[in-house]
From Swiss-Prot:
MF annotations from Gene Ontology: GTP binding; GTPase activity
Membership in a protein family: Belongs to the small GTPase superfamily. Rab family.
Protein source organism: Dictyostelium discoideum
Binding site for GTP: 14-21, 62-66, 120-123
A biological process term (GO) from this entry: phagosome-lysosome fusion
Record CDD domains: Rab
PROSITE patterns, per the entry: RAB (PS51419)
Keywords tagged on the record: Cell membrane, GTP-binding, Lipoprotein, Membrane, Nucleotide-binding, Prenylation
Protein name: Ras-related protein RabL
Length: 204
């Protein structure tokens, strides 16, 4: 029998300049690109891989963190199986704005929200102004305590030094497959249409 092919959608989110495109570019091309112009719109690529012995197509979306993109972003938030939520570990504002990005994700999801938290630019040594590991752990714990997700998966990455880039996308792919299976299961057991509060099909 022909193996069923599964398309999983992963969306990269976070403030402008945190290094989203550099991560995305590194994952696609296996290298760091210096002097890249800022993103002017969303971009994506599709990669074929095996996740837990299942043949899947990973559709990874890069977005730009600018306000003008956020104003038009809802179509890109929808239909995701996992989000990679990025902040720069040396940029306080990008860490504080994680709450804003979470609010956006929550609008389009229900149940356990599949996301991976990514602290970027780990090749730059931490200073007093950087976000401490203790603060990041506290942020993860708050999210877990609110029941938004059972366990936050956190990676500190460097696109520049190739640290944790593949690892983060491997975990995102695994979470995306789990989410895909749950949504598929719900749509099978509720074929006539979901009750209003479940909103299958309009969420991630
Ligand atoms: N040291 C270091 N710098 C990085 C790393 N990743 C990205 N940068 C730098 O951070 C800046 C922003 O990187 P981008 O990948 O363009 O950031 P972005 O989040 O996609 O920005 P927008 O497209 O505006 O949303 C660039 O100058 C990169 O060279 C990293 O791992 N280490």
């Amino acid at each position: 029998m022909k193996e069923e092919k599964t398309m999983l959608k992963i969306i990269t989110l976070g403030d402008s300049n945190v290094g989203k495109t550099s991560l995305f570019y590194h994952y696609v091309n296996g290298e760091y690109r210096y002097n890249r112009p800022p993103s002017i719109g969303p971009d994506y690529f599709i990669k074929e891989l095996k996740v837990e012995n299942k043949h899947v197509f990973l559709m990874v979306w890069d977005t730009c963190g600018q306000e003008r993109f956020q104003a038009f972003s809802p179509p890109y938030f929808r239909g995701a199986n996992c989000y990679t939520l990025c902040f720069d570990i040396h940029n306080e504002e990008s860490f504080i704005n994680l709450g804003k990005w979470m609010d956006e994700i929550i609008k389009y999801c229900y149940g356990n929200i599949p996301f991976v938290l990514v602290g970027t630019k780990s090749d730059i040594p931490r200073t007093d102004k950087s976000i401490s590991k203790a603060r990041i752990e506290q942020w993860c714990k708050n999210i877990e305590d609110q029941g938004i997700i059972d366990k936050v998966h956190y990676f500190e990455t460097s696109a520049k030094l190739s640290q944790n880039v593949t690892e983060l996308y491997n975990v995102a792919a695994k979470l995306a497959l789990e989410h895909y299976s749950i949504v598929k299961y719900i749509s099978i057991i509720r074929p006539i249409g979901p009750p209003e509060e479940v909103k299958v099909g309009t969420c991630c």
